[in-house]
Amino acid sequence: MLKIRLKRCGRKKQTSFKIVVMNNLDKRDGQAIEELGFMNPRTKEKYLNINKINHYLRLGAKPTKTVFDLLNKAKII
């Protein structure tokens, strides 16, 4: 099953996150199928590729709770 979830990146104590599509059994920092955007919680910077996100949602990918909340704020879902 595909999941749209956050993948941690960045330096220690200066984290940022990539929004990626992964198999639900893969590790958090495992290999992603595709990168859909990024989020930096420190600077509140976000980028979401809406076309790719909608494509994977139509294919049946389930967003995690955090990603679901991000998509709700961006009015994608």
From Swiss-Prot:
Report the record's Gene Ontology biological process terms.
Answer: mitochondrial translation
- The keyword Acyltransferase is assigned to this record: no
GO terms for cellular component: chloroplast; mitochondrion; small ribosomal subunit
Family the entry assigns: Belongs to the bacterial ribosomal protein bS16 family.
- The answer to keyword Endoplasmic reticulum applying to this record is no
Q: Please give the Gene Ontology molecular function terms for this protein.
A: structural constituent of ribosome
Protein name, as recorded: Small ribosomal subunit protein bS16c
Localization annotation: Plastid, Chloroplast
Extra facts: Although originally identified as Cyanidium caldarium, these sequences derive from Galdieria sulphuraria.
Q: Where are the transmembrane segments?
A: none
Please classify the protein's predominant subcellular localization into one broad category.
plastid
Matching Pfam families: Ribosomal_S16
Mind listing the UniProt keywords for this protein, alphabetically? Chloroplast, Plastid, Ribonucleoprotein, Ribosomal protein
What species is given as this protein's source?
A: Galdieria sulphuraria
Q: Which domain of life is it from?
A: Eukaryota
